[in-house]
Structures are given as structure tokens and as C-alpha cells.
């Protein structure tokens, strides 16, 4: 079994390119079906391919497992889905196979590959992705094992190291940037666009500064009302946002919209109504919620997820010792996963151990079924049960030892000597070692 991964993230691709490959959670299942169909139709070698997709603000990654790798076809499929050329995607992506896939997945789950080093949110996002793959019937034994081990390694990293200490979240970074623009955050009005997990985190951090007003704009009022009620805020429909945008000093947006929901014109009109008082805006969505041209307006201070990178990395130096500890834990996890793969892979030098065990069990079951059938026939004829049991046991013994006896007699002297050593080790151990 081969495992491969293809992805883009904040290290390799700019924000606008990442936005082309962002998949909302409810899009994952049909997307996985499309990928599996594509891999299966491209080659008969991939009828049972396993797939999973992780899509967040900072990364989109495809994980696959099949009898043979198909990285090139996976890249072509992803490029087509994002409407870019394979050459462009290749220049901004990374591809990994087997043990390197495990190392990468373990680092991602542990927060070592995040923009916010040590952040815990990615672990929940990975679990959501795995549940989506399971629900789509796209997850098999190999990828399930990979991700379950990823979660176990991440848990050990967080409990055994200080990787999450001193970290500054994206939400906290937004508050810090707002504090650089406004002297007193308790005197500002803040609008949050969306009602997902990231907006909830941002609302929590801003609420701690006791702003003058908190408002939630969301496509559905019910979800927005629940969040607003927690923080004593009010709520509006997303459609009403342009009419009220000028009322807010700070706007934090993170929705799953495929197109910008706050345009240049709306912000220009709002700034005029505000008589050019500054407006602080943070766009945490991928793809963008706020048109990038807004950044050119004199009184609009627009920040994206990539702009927050320098803020969230300020405490990174304090966590280098924890990173080294985490990498050691990950190394051990990778070795364990690779060993698990080798045991199950028929591509190893002497064949996979697990497939061989399965074949031995299958052969033994055939012999057992045959001898039991013979014994039942003899019992039905009225033969003595002691005689039947003796024949059954002798028949099983002969079948189990026939191949071994034949091998001991075959080949040259050197081959017979090697076979004799193996047979002695397997069959002539002491009773205590055999557990008898």
C-alpha cells in the first residue's frame, strides 16, 4: 500500500492562490467522490483508493492511499478543480510519500506547521476532515490509521511539551493590531461578520476589552443571535451590512463565502459617512471576504491572515526547546507508522507479514473445514467417536506438516540446512515458549 499527500499552505502559496483551493466542510464529501472517481478512471490500479481533504484558512491538503501512488494525476485533478495550470500549482505545492506523509501529518496535527506555532485549532479541523471522509466512505484502514496516530502524537506533544505556551492566536493578534490603531478599545464599535469558530474566538478576545458595541452580521439570524447573546451584542442580516458598515470602527470577517461580501464601493461610502475616521478591518477568510482593493483606501486599515503572521510569530523563540521535544515524539510516531505499513505491504523483500498471516489462517481454515466435514460423515455412519477424533487430528497434522516435510527433502544441502534451522525454530521450541 502506498500513501501520498499533495498540498499548498501559507509557506508555499499566496493568499489568493490558496483561496482557489478552499473547500467548505459541506463540499468535502462530493469533492472526495470526484477525486476518487478521477483516480479510478485514470488507471485500473486505483479502484479502492482512500482519500481525505483538509482545508483551512492556511492550507489545503489531499491525502491518499492505494496500491500504487498517483501523485501526478492528483496534482492534475487539483489544478483543474482550482482553475489553474498544473505547472503553476506544482510551483506552489508540496508532495510527499509514505513515511514523509506521516511526518507531515503528525507535525500539522501538533501545530508545528501552523502560522501560529503550537495552535490547537488545527487538530479540531483535522478531526472534522476525517469525519467528513468517513461520512463519504472515502476513508480506509490505512488513512484511518494515519490520522488516528496523528491525533495520538498531537496529544502526546501537547501533554509532554510546552509547545502551546506563549503562543499568540490569530484572534489575539487582531486585538493587538486594533490596539495599535485605537488608543482605547473600550470606546470602539466592533462588527463581526460570520458566526463560525474563528469569529467566536475573535469575539471572545475583543469582548475582554469591553468595547462600546458588539454586533454580529450573519447569513442566518438564528446562529448570529446565539453568538450575540453570549456577549451582550446585537445581530443583523448579512444583506443589511452595507447600510450599517459606517457605524463600526472595527470589522472582523470570516465566512465561507466563495466571493467577497464587502466590496470596495461599500467601504468607500462608509468612510465618507464616517468623515474619514479610520476603519480597522481584518479579513480572516480564505477565499477573501473583503475585496483586496480596500487596502488602497487612505482611512481603511485592512489586514489578512498572512498580514497577521509577523504578530503571531513574536513568541516563537520562546518555544524552540518545546519544538525539539515535539520533533522527537514525532520521530518515534513516524517509525511506528512506517513499521505498521511494512508489516502490511506485499512490496517488502519477503512479502508483507500481515498478508502472509492472513493466508496462513485461510489455509488452516480450509484444512479444518475439510477434516470436520469428513468427521461428520463418519459420525453419521455410526463410527466410534474416539476413532473419528483420532482420524481428524491425524488428518490435520498431516496437512500442516506435509509442505514442511517436502521442503526438508528438497533442494541442495545448503538449502536443506537453512530449512532445517527454520523448521527447528518454528516447530521444536520448548513448551514454555509455545505457551503450551
UniProtKB/Swiss-Prot annotation:
Assembly and oligomerization: Homodimer.
Function: Catalyzes the NADPH-dependent reduction of glutamyl-tRNA(Glu) to glutamate 1-semialdehyde (GSA).
One example of a Gene Ontology biological process annotation: protoporphyrinogen IX biosynthetic process from glutamate
Name the record gives this protein: Glutamyl-tRNA reductase
EC number, UniProt record: 1.2.1.70
Disulfide bonds, paired cysteine numbers: none
Domain of life: Bacteria
Domain comment as written in the entry: Possesses an unusual extended V-shaped dimeric structure with each monomer consisting of three distinct domains arranged along a curved 'spinal' alpha-helix. The N-terminal catalytic domain specifically recognizes the glutamate moiety of the substrate. The second domain is the NADPH-binding domain, and the third C-terminal domain is responsible for dimerization.
Positions of substrate binding: 56-59, 114, 119-121, 125
Record keywords: NADP, Oxidoreductase, Porphyrin biosynthesis
CDD domains the record matches: NAD_bind_Glutamyl_tRNA_reduct
Gene: hemA
Pathway in which the depicted protein is active: Porphyrin-containing compound metabolism; protoporphyrin-IX biosynthesis; 5-aminolevulinate from L-glutamyl-tRNA(Glu): step 1/2
One GO MF term: glutamyl-tRNA reductase activity
Active site per database record: 57
Note: During catalysis, the active site Cys acts as a nucleophile attacking the alpha-carbonyl group of tRNA-bound glutamate with the formation of a thioester intermediate between enzyme and glutamate, and the concomitant release of tRNA(Glu). The thioester intermediate is finally reduced by direct hydride transfer from NADPH, to form the product GSA.
Entry's family note: Belongs to the glutamyl-tRNA reductase family.
Organism: Acidovorax sp. (strain JS42)
Binding-site list for NADP(+): 194-199
Catalytic activity: (S)-4-amino-5-oxopentanoate + tRNA(Glu) + NADP(+) = L-glutamyl-tRNA(Glu) + NADPH + H(+)
Pfam families: GlutR_dimer, GlutR_N, Shikimate_DH
UniProt xrefs under InterPro entries: 4pyrrol_synth_GluRdtase (IPR000343), 4pyrrol_synth_GluRdtase_dimer (IPR015896), 4pyrrol_synth_GluRdtase_N (IPR015895), GluRdtase_CS (IPR018214), GluRdtase_dimer_dom_sf (IPR036453), GluRdtase_N_sf (IPR036343), NAD(P)-bd_dom_sf (IPR036291), Shikm_DH/Glu-tRNA_Rdtase (IPR006151)
Annotated site (Important for activity): 104
Amino acid at each position: 500500500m502506498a500513501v501520498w499527500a499533495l498540498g499548498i499552505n501559507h509557506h508555499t502559496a499566496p493568499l489568493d492562490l490558496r483561496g482557489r483551493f478552499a473547500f467548505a466542510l459541506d463540499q468535502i464529501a462530493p469533492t472526495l467522490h470526484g477525486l476518487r472517481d478521477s483516480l479510478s478512471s485514470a488507471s485500473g490500479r486505483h479502484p479502492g483508493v482512500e482519500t481525505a481533504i483538509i482545508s483551512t484558512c492556511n492550507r489545503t491538503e489531499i491525502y491518499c492511499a492505494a496500491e500504487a501512488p498517483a501523485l501526478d494525476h492528483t496534482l492534475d485533478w487539483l489544478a483543474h478543480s482550482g482553475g489553474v495550470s498544473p505547472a503553476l500549482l506544482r510551483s506552489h505545492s508540496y508532495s510527499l510519500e509514505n513515511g514523509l506523509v506521516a511526518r507531515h501529518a503528525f507535525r500539522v496535527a501538533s501545530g508545528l506547521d501552523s502560522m501560529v506555532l503550537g495552535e490547537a485549532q488545527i487538530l479540531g479541523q483535522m478531526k472534522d476532515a476525517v469525519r467528513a471522509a468517513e461520512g463519504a466512505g472515502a476513508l480506509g484502514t490505512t488513512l484511518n490509521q494515519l490520522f488516528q496516530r496523528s491525533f495520538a502524537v498531537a496529544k502526546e506533544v501537547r501533554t509532554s511539551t510546552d509547545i502551546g505556551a506563549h503562543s499568540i492566536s490569530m484572534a489575539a493578534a487582531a486585538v493587538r493590531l486594533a490596539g495599535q490603531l485605537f488608543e482605547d478599545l473600550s470606546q470602539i464599535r466592533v462588527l463581526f461578520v460570520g458566526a463560525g469558530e474563528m469569529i467566536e474566538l475573535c469575539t471572545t478576545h475583543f469582548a475582554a476589552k469591553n468595547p462600546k458595541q458588539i454586533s454580529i452580521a450573519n447569513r442566518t439570524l438564528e446562529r448570529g443571535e446565539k453568538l450575540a447573546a453570549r456577549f451582550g451584542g446585537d445581530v443583523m442580516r448579512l444583506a443589511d451590512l452595507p447600510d450599517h458598515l459606517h457605524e463600526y470602527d472595527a470589522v472582523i470577517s470570516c465566512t465561507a463565502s466563495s466571493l467577497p461580501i464587502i466590496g470596495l464601493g461599500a467601504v468607500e461610502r462608509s468612510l465618507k459617512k464616517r468623515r474619514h475616521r479610520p476603519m480597522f478591518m481584518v479579513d480572516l477568510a480564505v477565499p477573501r471576504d473583503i475585496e483586496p482593493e480596500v487596502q488602497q483606501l487612505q482611512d481603511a486599515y485592512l489586514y489578512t491572515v498572512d498580514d497577521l503572521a509577523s504578530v503571531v510569530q513574536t513568541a516563537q523563540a520562546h518555544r524552540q526547546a518545546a519544538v525539539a521535544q515535539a520533533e522527537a515524539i514525532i520521530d518515534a510516531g513516524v517509525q511506528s507508522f512506517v513499521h505498521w505499513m511494512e508489516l502490511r505491504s506485499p512490496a517488502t523483500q519477503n512479502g508483507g507479514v500481515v498478508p502472509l498471516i492472513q493466508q496462513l489462517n485461510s489455509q488452516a481454515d480450509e484444512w479444518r473445514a475439510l477434516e470436520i466435514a469428513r468427521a461428520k460423515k463418519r459420525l453419521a455412519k455410526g463410527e466410534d467417536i474416539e476413532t473419528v477424533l483420532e482420524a481428524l487430528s491425524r488428518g490435520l497434522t498431516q496437512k500442516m506438516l506435509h509442505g514442511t516435510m517436502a521442503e526438508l527433502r528438497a533442494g541442495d544441502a545448503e538449502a536443506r540446512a537453512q530449512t532445517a534451522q527454520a523448521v527447528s525454530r518454528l516447530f521444536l521450541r520448548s513448551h514454555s515458549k509455545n505457551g503450551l
